[in-house]
UniProtKB/Swiss-Prot annotation:
Pfam families for the chain: V-set
Assigned keywords, A-Z: Adaptive immunity, Cell membrane, Disulfide bond, Immunity, Immunoglobulin domain, Membrane, Receptor, Signal, T cell receptor
Signal peptide start-end: 1-21
Top-level taxon of the source organism: Eukaryota
Gene Ontology terms: biological process: adaptive immune response; cell surface receptor signaling pathway
Chief localization: membrane
Record function comment: V region of the variable domain of T cell receptor (TR) beta chain that participates in the antigen recognition. Alpha-beta T cell receptors are antigen specific receptors which are essential to the immune response and are present on the cell surface of T lymphocytes. Recognize peptide-major histocompatibility (MH) (pMH) complexes that are displayed by antigen presenting cells (APC), a prerequisite for efficient T cell adaptive immunity against pathogens.
Protein name: T cell receptor beta variable 11-3
Organism: Homo sapiens (Human)
InterPro entries: Ig-like_dom_sf, Ig-like_fold, Ig_V-set, TCR_beta_variable
Amino acid sequence: MGTRLLCWVAFCLLVEELIEAGVVQSPRYKIIEKKQPVAFWCNPISGHNTLYWYLQNLGQGPELLIRYENEEAVDDSQLPKDRFSAERLKGVDSTLKIQPAELGDSAVYLCASSL
């Protein structure tokens, strides 16, 4: 009985570690009216210092919007700066904002991280 309980606890801890191992992005989806602001939040994998925001239009591959090394934006050449903005605080969480959002901004916005 004790061995079975120990195995169950070890399994639960392993599953919890696997669940928490990925990038966390919020919201999963967002529906807004035109001209309203929208913000996306990303928490990268712990220990990763490089963070990426991508935009993926319907039927196309992801396009890099901005890349951060720690807090510094090192490649933001594809970020439309008139209505889009991004920041990364303390080299951890990041936000991507669109204000005001236009119909043409309808897309999938993805966050990724790496060492």
